[in-house]
Amino acid sequence: MDSFLACSNLTVRFYEQPNPVLHQVSLSIQKGEKVLILGPSGSGKSTLISVLAGIIPEHMEAEVQGEVMRQRHTGVMFQDPDSQFCMHRVNEEIAFSLENRSVPREQMDDMIQHLMKKVQLDVDPNTDIHTLSGGMKQRLALACLLALEPDVLFFDEPTAQLDPAGRMEIFQLLQQLSAEQNQTMIFVEHVLDGVIEWMDRVILLDHQGRIIADGTPKDVMNTFEGEMKEAGIWRPKIFPEKWSTIVQDSFHPLSQTLLQTFEARKERHETSTNREVIIRTDHLQLSYGKKSIIDDLHLDIKAGDWVAIIGENGSGKSTFLKHVIRLEPIKKGHIFLKGKHLKKWSDRTLYEKAGFVFQNPELQFIQDTVFDEIAFGGRQRNWPESVVQEKTNQLLAEFGLEKHRDVHPFTLSLGQKRRLSVATMLLFDQDVLILDEPTFGQDEKTARELIRRLKERQRQGTTIIMVTHDMELVDECADQVLVFHQGEHVYDGSPFDLFSHQELVTSCELIVPLHYRYMAERKEVMTIAK
């Protein structure tokens, strides 16, 4: 069978880096295949699809050796949707894609509405793109991609910024499209559940950008589990097992593991009551631009707690963080930090007390090298250079960035950029550390190391406030969970109580950690058996 996409002995090196990011890669993909590319952070996954899509070297400079066979009409959905938008409004952005297909203007409005409905982008077509949440931007990017009707669709973590329910909806949509149109699709993904089940092949890269496995999902998962764990690659929680089998068989190894995890969470279940309040909101209105999201928000955050803020895309989670750090102006209501009104803190003192890690790491980079980016804050505070050097080198080592110390932050992979953004904040000993999607784009090993570092910082008394879509992370780390849903603050309490509250979980469309789902469905099985 003739190849639809292929490369032979492909080696790619970016000019500012001494070593290739991809090394002697050879593969062949047939028309209609669904292929998942896996590998640790920085292994060249995004580079590989950029070469196959024709972005490298046509639009991005790099030294490319080997042979590549591409299709003429390709579409790519990137990790960061902002990087591919060129218009101001939602309908204009989709229309731009349709214009590239020479669609008559009089047909566009109906097609735009159809595409928005297909990706569940439920906003006014005239909405300014910059006012959309990260997840809504991902949906818009997908609509633009589908408008092009390309021969091959490339997806670089297409649901990374979506809430769990939205993530499953998009993957179900893509699975439906692939079945209806025999569409060739190439994916790069960190979180495998919901996508690996319908892939034809899995290609596994190592840290050096070499292919170490290429086969069916089941074969690769079973044969290379040790290599994947060592490389820090997330594994699916259920696949290749069947969920129905796990629930029905209480002696199944996964059943035993889920029961033990549930009991451990139950024992850990407690609320902190004796700590002082470090952040308090009073009649606060969450608003972004002219849009009001939540009115009259009252909540307390206690010193030393790990607080998780969850909810659907557009519910105000990131906006709340920006209000707390004064990046978004407060139009109504009040925020108090350590009993003092937020308006009364000077910028310098506020940022010495609270650090903020953006959802998009590039927004906080201001230096030309990774080393200088981490060192910048200490130098601004006139630390002795010996102290700056010592602390910076320590953080480079702990976050696996030593070999990138002299490169520009913008040339890092998304996972490496995220590690750098957190490392710059951990240079200091702030009272409050605020993180927007801290594990976004991380492989399992680096995510675990990051969480270990944050837990250590919490043990030293730092208050951690994070926005996340990772419910396992919430369950493992959070002392307090805040749920924002459809313009309301609907929950304030422990993870255990939240995930055990079936009615609330259902109404908020939360996808709970598997051990809670297992216990709920196991009760149903036992009830039917009786």
Can you say where each PLM-predicted feature lies in the sequence?
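Catalytic Walker B motif of ABC-type/P-loop ATPase nucleotide-binding domains
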Residues: 153-156, 433-436
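Conserved ABC ATPase "signature" region
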Residues: 107-124, 386-404
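A short, surface-exposed alpha-helical micro-motif characterized by mixed small hydrophobic
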Residues: 195-197, 474-476
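Conserved beta-strand-loop-alpha-helix hinge in the C-terminal portion
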Residues: 210-233, 488-511
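Conserved ABC ATPase signature
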Residues: 128-132, 408-412
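ABC ATPase nucleotide-binding domains
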Residues: 228-279, 501, 505-530
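Helix-to-loop junction immediately C-terminal to a conserved catalytic motif
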Residues: 53, 325
